Amino acid sequence: MRFSVVTSYLLCAAASYANAASLFGLSFPEPPSANKPIPGDSPLLQCDVDQSQSLDVTQVNLVPNPPQRGENLTIAAAGVLQTTIEEGAYIDIEVRLGYIKLISQTYDLCEQLEENDIDGLKCPIEEGVYELNKIVEIPSEVPPGKYSVIARAYNVDDEQITCLTGEVIFPAY
């Protein structure tokens, strides 16, 4: 109840503000987006672009795009790493199905690279240009819905490596 009252109040205030601005001929610039598209064929965006990041993701391709239940997904990514990734680097991942948070977890980035055999990468990962390929199986049991993912990777000193976000819709069966 309290949420709906507060939400209604905020929506009314926003509508009143918009009406007053148009009534007096005022226009306000759109706030800058903190996301930018990543070249290639994927739904991924680089997020937190207003913050310093040590990985410039130059391209991501998914085959098939969009991903399909019960099929393999081939991920091809390229980027330029500007700082060495050391042991102790970590990644914060959040996955939502609609408004429902399914996962919100921190993982050891170096362990994940080794466990998932990402082109043989192991920490420390030196500065340089990288092209990575990985095939993952999408389970046929994935429930229908709109999935949102955000992943922020940090080095051991808490400097951001990168931030990626995207949405995938799995239609009804």
Swiss-Prot record:
GO terms for molecular function: sterol binding. GO terms for biological process: intracellular sterol transport. Residues 21-34 form a propeptide. The keyword Transport applies. Keywords: Lipid transport, Signal, Transport. Pfam families: E1_DerP2_DerF2 (PF02221). The keyword Signal applies. Residues 1-20 form the signal peptide. CDD domains: PG-PI_TP. Catalyzes the intermembrane transfer of phosphatidylglycerol and phosphatidylinositol. Belongs to the NPC2 family. Monomer. This is Phosphatidylglycerol/phosphatidylinositol transfer protein. It comes from Kluyveromyces lactis (strain ATCC 8585 / CBS 2359 / DSM 70799 / NBRC 1267 / NRRL Y-1140 / WM37). The gene is NPC2.
